Amino acid sequence: MQESRSIVVTIAVEPAPLRSVCPRMTDTSPASNARNYPLLAIPHIQLHGAVDDAMYDTFKTQLAAAPTDGPLVVSITTLGGDPEVARAMGDTIRLLREYTGRETLFLGKVAVYSAGATFMSAFPVDSRFLTRGSRIMVHERQMQSTIELNGPLNSLSNALEAKLHEIEDSIEIQEEGFRALVDGSKVALDDLRARAASAWYIEAEEARDLGLVLDII
C-alpha cells in the first residue's frame, strides 16, 4: 500500500506599507489653512492651566530649551490666573523681540481667558493666532480688600488714601494692558473698556474680524 504524503506550503505576505492604508492626518479641506502657517504646528513653548508661578517656571524652562534663532512660537490654554505672572512672561517675550529682533508668534488654543489675554497682549496683532473654536475673554481687574480703620481720627485718612492710590495704580496697569491688546486692531479702547466691565467673550472668528488676531488655524 503506497504511503500518502501531504505537503504544506507557507507563503509569507508582507503587509502593505502603513502610509498606503492609513489616511493622512493633515486636514486638506478648503476650510483649513494650517499649511499656510507651518511654524505653528509644534510650538516651542506650550503652556496650559492656571497662570501662576508653576506656569512661569514651565515657561522659563521651555524658553531655555527653545532654539536661539528663528521665530519663537508660544501657545497657551488657560482660564486665567495671576495677571502679574502674565505680565512678567509677556515682558520676557517683549524684551526677547526688542533685543534680538526675533519674531514671536502667539497661538491661543481653546480658551484664552483673563490673564491669558493679558499675556496675548505682549504680541503684536499680526503675530497672534487662534485655533478654531477658541475664545478670548477680557474683563476688568478684580480686587477684594477690607479696610480696617483703627487709631486717631487724623491718621485714618492716610489709610484711605493709601488704598485709593493702590486702586488708581491698578487701573493704570489695566489701561496699559487694554491699550496693548487693541493696538493695531479695529477695536477702540473705549469700546474695550465698556465691554470688559461685564466680561467680554470673543469667539475666534470675531477676534479675527476685529483684527485682534491675524488668523484662525
Predicted features by range, described:
Residues 2-217:
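Terminal-region recognition feature
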